[in-house]
UniProtKB/Swiss-Prot annotation:
Expressed in brain, heart, skeletal muscle, kidney and lung. Expressed in maturing tubular epithelia, with the most prominent expression in the medulla and the papilla. Expressed in thin ascending limb of the loop of Henle and the distal convoluted tubule. Expressed in all layers of transitional ureteric epithelium and in the ureteric smooth-muscle cells (at protein level). Widely expressed. Highly expressed in many brain regions, including in cerebellum, olfactory, hippocampus and cerebral cortex. GO terms for cellular component: anchoring junction; apical plasma membrane; basolateral plasma membrane; cytoplasm. Gene3D superfamilies: Transferase(Phosphotransferase) domain 1. It comes from the Eukaryota. Acts as a positive regulator of ERK phosphorylation downstream of fibroblast growth factor-receptor activation. Involved in the regulation of both caspase-dependent apoptosis and caspase-independent cell death. In the skin, it plays a predominant role in suppressing caspase-dependent apoptosis in response to UV stress in a range of dermal cell types. One of its GO terms (biological process) is cellular response to fibroblast growth factor stimulus. PANTHER family: DUAL SERINE/THREONINE AND TYROSINE PROTEIN KINASE (PTHR46392), DUAL SERINE_THREONINE AND TYROSINE PROTEIN KINASE (PTHR46392:SF1). It comes from Mus musculus. PROSITE patterns: PROTEIN_KINASE_ATP (PS00107), PROTEIN_KINASE_DOM (PS50011), PROTEIN_KINASE_ST (PS00108). Keywords: ATP-binding, Cell junction, Cell membrane, Coiled coil, Cytoplasm, Kinase, Membrane, Nucleotide-binding, Serine/threonine-protein kinase, Transferase, Tyrosine-protein kinase. This is Dual serine/threonine and tyrosine protein kinase. Belongs to the protein kinase superfamily. Ser/Thr protein kinase family.
Length: 927
């Protein structure tokens, strides 16, 4: 039911008392700012969740379709992104940590709400009136807490004034209130109190909800806590904290806290860590006067709050300009200083936003680093796997040819070895045969004959004995001939195969294991002639056939002499030359068979790796072109949100210069850094946004280095150019001038060579971090007031694994291979060679060979054909040789910067010493 109360639309900023319109405007501005930045944080979180869902979908075997559109369906419950992990693979570790996601989701879902606690109901009502600037609640009630029955009051925004009873989070009660009966300016007391004699339980539990057309309520809801005797403050705060971010105020009107008040605050602090704003409301009869106590004097209230842990003994209220001040509890005893509530709420809300932005940026940065590391791993896999396969094929072929040579030339040696072995072992074999006890054959002790089947079994066992003993002896001698090959070839091959089978592709893993088994069966077992192996028995199959030709006339008696005779006949029937020929023949046959099986398995492995590498290359492309840039942009937004919250938007000073992609301004002070340079970049399209975001990530990820320009932070200006575009403001260290300007003004030889050393040191550091600058030139080398150099503008800087082969850079500094799209960090060495030409010349004049070029295409064609800067008369021989080495057309012939650096030091020591002794010798000073 609607009440006929007064409208406060025109009075919302001009009410009586110490609240005043200024305080209300500040509060409105603070909560409005929080909502604005919370919206950006919510959008970033939504896009981050969608990013992780897309990652999971694109790299899972099956994925349900994502719901269209935004809203709750798109966001899903907190933590659902990480429930189903990615399958094993390169990106299986990319997921949104559930704890961080839950925390962030809860934060963006909870809007702020001002909660008013207090010593008694009068103080709470009076503080509410001060906040709204109008007399909404009565303040002439009884002071006795025991007689107070104030229910919970909730003030929200609406176009018309309305008062009603409602169960929290449920439904509105149809109940006639006193405020419904007539016009009113102050809500009647009977509507505020709980009628405990009421038979309706819902009426006792209900909140009084007041809807008002008020500027402050348009930004934030206000809840007045009920009387503690009706409901404890801890329970009220617990319910509120589930759905809102409470900004807790505590209204005081006495000089000291009562025992009951201390207990209430002690319980709140025990369960919650929220700071509180303690405000002593003015006495009703002197509402416009201030307290007589000086601010510097500490009241009994202050001491009590220190004892309770809300304030520290050295506590000083943070001033608004201190952006890094953490939200702490405040005590304000001067009524005219109620405006400090805006400072308190600003710090509280800002800290929440900053903490959330930091947590989100940590997730972005961590996953982005994983992407970059995985890109390196994938690039190495693409490069090294084909080389490993080729190496395996080559080594196996060498092993095969070596073993075939052994089989061809060892036949005579093997014959002599067999004859020698037989002669050496003959008596031992005969004795062993005579003393042999047969298995599964019963030999009569009385000398009776046995059947033909038993005789054949006995002969076969004697033959097996001779074969096995002879086999072992021959094998032990033969192994020494080829054992070194097993160590040299098989071990290397097995290690190479082990590296190849580390693939996570199951089919390739099986293929590689099969190949390894083939290798062991074909070479390792056969070469070493392990006893009992199937291969060894096959090699001696012909020996069995020869021995089996032994004949007998009548079934003999099994005696020692008979056993020796059978063994003697078996030994005599062996032909050493035939055995050697048979062994070598089977050896060659087996080698050929194994070689073919190996080659077939290697082709199968190669095919498996080919498919895997194709998928890896596709994934590498996705990481470089889609995943990493998309996540980098989210990271840029979350970090920029953190920076603007902490340090506000920087003020643009005078223009310092313009580049291809942005304008550089002077910025006097930002984030505690002075002075600064501000680079304003308006990305024209998605690609430039992605490049800028990645550049920012690389710069922020780099440790500070004295040869690189520091990046202090970034801010995204959504209203750049009057709202016509969105700009990224990069706030950096400001230096004195660039190298182009320095050379133009004139620098001494020693200074120029020191600049060259500084540049090499900076490039070496970038390379040590896996980055390639790709645009080393005069304008990108800045000088401080001591003319020490720092490298700037990492706009084209990328890790090698993230480079797509795009043609970037400044034409005269671009290495020839840049035009092919296949290059590495040696392009920076080439660019340094050109830069060193300018440094040695002491001038900004273009090399003559480049000056003659009419266009960029003409210049590029000449560079590809080998055109380089000319040698000037002032050049020292060693300097010229260093330039030529650096800009060599073959990247492999360019010196490493670790070699260039000591060469430069040597040149500097020699030339500067010579210059001091003979000023006109060698390089001239351009001063």
């Amino acid at each position: 039911m609607e009440a006929d109360g007064q409208s406060w639309a025109g009075e919302s900023v001009s009410g009586p008392g110490p609240g005043g319109g200024g305080m209300i405007r500040e509060l409105c501005r603070g909560f409005s700012r929080y909502r604005r930045y919370l919206g950006r944080l919510r959008q970033n979180l939504r896009e981050t969740q969608k990013f992780f869902r897309d990652i999971k979908c694109s790299h899972s075997h099956s994925c349900p379709s994502s719901p269209a559109g935004g809203g709750a369906a798109e966001l899903g419950p907190a933590g659902d992104v990480a429930e189903a992990p990615l399958p094993a693979g390169q990106l299986s570790c990319i997921s949104f940590p559930p704890m961080e996601e839950t925390y962030l989701q809860q934060l963006v879902d909870r809007l702020p709400c001002i909660l008013i606690l207090g010593q008694d109901c009068n103080a709470k009502c009076q503080l509410l009136n001060l906040l709204l600037g109008v007399q909404v609640l009565p303040t002439l009630k009884l002071d006795s807490d025991e007689s107070c029955k104030l229910r919970r009051l909730r003030f929200t925004y609406g176009t018309r004034t309305r008062v009603s009873l409602a169960l929290p989070g449920q439904y509105e009660l149809v109940h006639t209130l006193a405020s419904h009966q007539d016009n009113w300016e102050t809500i009647p007391e009977e509507d505020l109190e709980v009628q405990e004699d009421s038979e309706d339980a819902a009426h006792v539990l209900a909140d009084l909800e007041v809807t008002m057309h008020h500027a402050l309520l348009q930004e934030v809801d206000i809840v007045v806590a009920p009387c503690p005797s009706h409901r404890p403050s801890v329970d009220v705060l617990s319910d509120l904290a589930n759905d809102f971010l409470p900004v807790i105020t505590y209204a005081l009107h006495k000089d000291e806290l009562s025992e009951r008040g201390e207990q209430e605050l002690r319980e709140v602090r025990q369960y919650f860590s929220f700071p509180m704003f303690f405000f002593k409301v003015p006495k009703l009869e002197i509402i416009s006067s201030s307290s007589g106590r000086a601010e510097s004097e500490r009241s009994p209230l202050y001491g009590q709050l220190v004892d309770l842990g809300y304030l520290s003994s050295s506590h000083r209220n943070c001033v608004p300009s201190d952006q890094d001040c953490k939200a702490q509890s405040m005590l304000v005893e001067q009524s005219e200083k109620l405006k400090q509530l805006s400072t308190f709420s600003h710090q509280l809300l800002q800290n929440r936003l900053v903490d959330a932005a930091k947590a989100l940026n940590v997730v972005h940065s961590h996953c982005l680093d994983i992407f970059i590391n995985q890109a390196f791993d994938m690039q190495r896999d693409l490069q090294i796997t084909p080389k490993r396969l080729e190496y395996t094929r080559k080594k196996e072929n060498e092993l095969y040819e070596s073993l075939m040579n052994i089989a061809n030339r060892k036949q005579e040696e093997m014959k002599d070895m067999i004859v020698e072995t037989l002669n050496t072992m003959k008596e031992e074999l005969l004795d062993d045969a005579a003393n042999m006890e047969f298995k599964d054959v019963i030999v009569p002790e009385n000398g009776e004959t046995i059947g033909t089947r038993e005789i054949k079994s006995c002969i076969r066992q004697i033959q097996e004995l001779i074969i096995s003993r002879l086999n072992q002896a021959v094998a032990n001698k033969l192994i020494s001939s080829v054992d070194y090959l097993r160590e040299s070839f098989v071990g290397t091959l097995e290690r190479c195969l082990q590296s190849l089978e580390k693939s996570q592709d199951v089919s390739v893993h099986i293929t590689s294991n099969y190949l390894k088994q083939i290798l062991n069966a074909a070479y390792h077992v056969e070469v070493t002639f392990h006893s009992g192996s199937s291969v060894t028995r096959m090699l001696w199959e012909q020996i069995k056939q020869i021995i089996q030709r032994i004949t007998w006339v009548n079934p003999p008696t099994i005696t020692l002499e008979w056993k020796r005779k059978v063994a003697q006949e078996a030994i005599d029937s062996l032909s050493a030359s035939k055995l050697a020929k048979s062994i070598c023949s089977q050896f060659r046959t087996r080698l050929n068979s194994s070689h073919e099986a190996f080659a077939a398995s290697l082709r199968q492995l190669e095919a498996g790796h080919s498919g895997r590498l194709e998928k890896t290359e596709d994934l590498w492309l996705k990481v470089r072109k889609d995943h990493a840039p998309r996540l980098a942009r989210l990271s840029l937004e979350s970090r920029s949100l953190q920076d603007v919250l902490l340090h506000r938007k920087p003020k643009l000073g005078q223009e310092l210069g313009r580049g291809q992609y942005g304008v550089v301004y002077l910025c006097d002070n930002w984030g505690g850094h002075f002075p600064c340079a501000l680079k304003s970049v308006v990305p024209p399209d998605e690609k430039h946004w992605n490049d800028l975001a990645l550049e920012f990530h690389y710069m922020r990820s780099l440790p500070k280095h004295e040869r690189l320009v520091d990046l202090h932070g970034s801010v995204i200006d959504y209203n750049y150019g009057g709202g016509s575009s969105v700009a990224v403001l990069l706030i950096m260290e400001r230096l004195h001038r660039d190298l182009y300007t320095g050379l133009k003004a004139g620098l001494t030889l020693e200074t120029r060579l020191q600049i060259a050393l500084d540049v090499v040191e900076g490039i070496r550091f970038l390379h040590s971090q896996g980055l390639v600058h790709r645009d080393i030139k005069l304008k990108n080398v800045l000088l401080d007031k001591q003319n020490r150099a720092k490298i700037t503008d990492l706009g084209f800087c990328k890790p090698e694994a993230m480079m797509s082969g795009s043609i970037v850079g400044t034409p005269i500094h671009m290495a020839p291979e840049l035009f092919t799209g296949k290059y590495d960090n040696s392009v920076d060495v080439y660019a340094f060679g050109i830069l060193f030409w300018y440094i040695c010349s002491g001038s900004i004049k273009l090399p003559e060979a480049f000056e003659r070029c009419a266009s960029k295409d003409h210049l590029w064609n000449n560079v590809r054909r080998g055109t380089r800067p000319e040698r000037l008369p002032v050049f020292d021989e060693e300097c010229w040789q260093l330039m030529e080495a650096c800009w060599d057309g073959d990247p492999l012939k360019r010196p490493l910067l670790g070699i260039v650096q000591p060469m430069l030091r040597s040149i500097m020591d020699r030339l500067c010493k010579c210059s001091s002794e003979q000023p006109n010798r060698g390089l001239d000073d351009s001063t």
